[in-house]
Amino acid sequence: MEKTEESVGIRVYTATPPQKPSPSPPSRSPKPVLISSLPSLPSGAAAGGGRGRKRRMVAQGVQKTVSKTSMLVNFLPTGTLLMFEMVLPSIYRDGDCNGINTLMIHLLLLLCAMSCFFFHFTDSFKASDGKIYYGFVTPRGLAVFMKPPPPEFGGGDVIAEAEIPVTDDRYKLTVNDFVHAVMSVLVFMAIAFSDRRVTGCLFPGKEKEMDQVMESFPIMVGIVCSALFLVFPTTRYGVGCMTG
């Protein structure tokens, strides 16, 4: 007889019977919520949200304007652009472009353009007393704004004793002065019309067309003005310029 090998195993018995899994409760579908049952926002909050979006759009427009025209600021008198950026928000307010606001924007643009034009016909010199005197350049020389008191009043002849006399050729009116004045006005208009607050009031309904034009116009103005300023150099240190 042949021997057969039997497998040996160990079986473990437990005293507690296995627990049956409890049936899961049937899933309930969420009840639909009617839109009419939701609480409605007050009209003031909705209006405030609209004003907030409008202010954000204005802020983005200002930031875009500054980024595109930052290279042109050096061609302007320092106080002109500062005055424009300070007065424009008070005129524009919340974007209400009525007839009065549009007229005030026209007057602001005219005033800033005139300052850019006339400030390029000013120059300055440092007198022997250490003070800096400003004046308009004329075909005869520099017409000083505020002359010192005469000698009989204890002032002394400061202009005659200045290091550079006002009748010098450098203080006489030249073609370069007109070129720089016209280019300065052109630069300011490029910066002003790059602002959506200006184009939105002056050209209502044509914001897209103006945006397309002003995408490249400031760059072209910067290139042309840079070339002309190299061809027609100037040594003026007038109002709004840093004195040497």
Curated annotation (Swiss-Prot):
The keyword Chloroplast does not apply. Restricted to flowers and pollen. Keywords: Endoplasmic reticulum, Membrane, Transmembrane, Transmembrane helix, Vacuole. GO terms for biological process: double fertilization forming a zygote and endosperm; endomembrane system organization; pollen sperm cell differentiation. This is Protein DMP9. It comes from Arabidopsis thaliana. Residues 18-29 have a biased composition (Pro residues). Induction: Activated by DUO1 in sperm cells (SC) of mature pollen. Belongs to the plant DMP1 protein family. One of its GO terms (cellular component) is endoplasmic reticulum membrane.
